[in-house]
Amino acid sequence: MPRAAAPPVQPAVPPKPIVTTTVIITHPACLQHEMGPDHPECPDRLTAIHDQLIASGLDPHLARREAPPATPEQLARVHDRRYVAAIQAAAPSSGLRYLDPDTALNPHSVDAALHAAGAVVHAVDLVCGGLYQTAFCAVRPPGHHACRARAMGFCIFNNVAVAARHALEAHGLERVAVI
């Protein structure tokens, strides 16, 4: 007597589709900030992130959002208003203008810095609003060394502090951990 075909094996728990829980926030202006041909803080940093997301297979599983520029009010939570105005006025029409030995502006740098700071504010809003569990800001110039009234260490605005202050003041959080 012929054997009946075995029924297909069903997994105990059906696999769940990958749900987009992470958003990447960036802006094309961040690729325009350049501090010279041999400077380590360069557009290739963002290109490398993009390339690795594709190579790893993660890219299709991530949401993408374009960063808005930070507002003067958002920056003023962390930076002296005179400093913000001075940075905006310091952008050269061509070439580079150095703010410190490590940090320079080109004609596109202020726009890039405003969008980098705006990205972190947008990330806080998206995560605190429950739209995503996590956010990654692929932006430059970086923003963790800048002081209240001074650029430093490749950083024009302190994006990390801008994000933390925004979380505290706009979303009513009591504490923020910066890791």
Residue ranges and their predicted role:
Residues 2-4, 11-179:
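HDAC/HDAC-like amidohydrolase catalytic core signature
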